[in-house]
Amino acid sequence: MKQLVTFEVQDGENEYRDYGIYDHKYSDEEIIKHFYGLDNIDEENGWYWKDTSIVRINNAEDIDRDKIKIMKDYGVAYEHNI
């Protein structure tokens, strides 16, 4: 089973969320590096620096194939393989 990962991003006063679908076997750091295309990231109190923004995994919950299809159909989240 895969997991729906919710990223929380803070960029100055702006806050937003991104979504991705990953296998359970990856760490938060690996997922963040892959999703944002980063080679090296610095961690501070559970947040990771991405240029001038900070990002963390806010939530990760199991998702089944039917829900994955719905997320893809609506362009909300896609499956990622590291």
What are these model-predicted stretches?
Residues 5, 26, 51-52:
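Intrinsically disordered, low-complexity segments enriched in Ser/Pro/Gly/Ala and basic residues
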Residues 38-82:
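Short, mixed-charge low-complexity intrinsically disordered segments
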Residues 15-26:
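A short, exposed loop/beta-hairpin motif centered on an aromatic-Gly-Thr core
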Residues 2-15:
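Short aromatic-glycine-(Arg/Gly/Cys) micro-motifs in beta-strand/loop hairpins
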Residues 28-29, 64:
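A broad, structure-centric signal for solvent-exposed, well-ordered loop/edge residues
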Residues 31-36:
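Short amphipathic, charge-patterned alpha-helical segments
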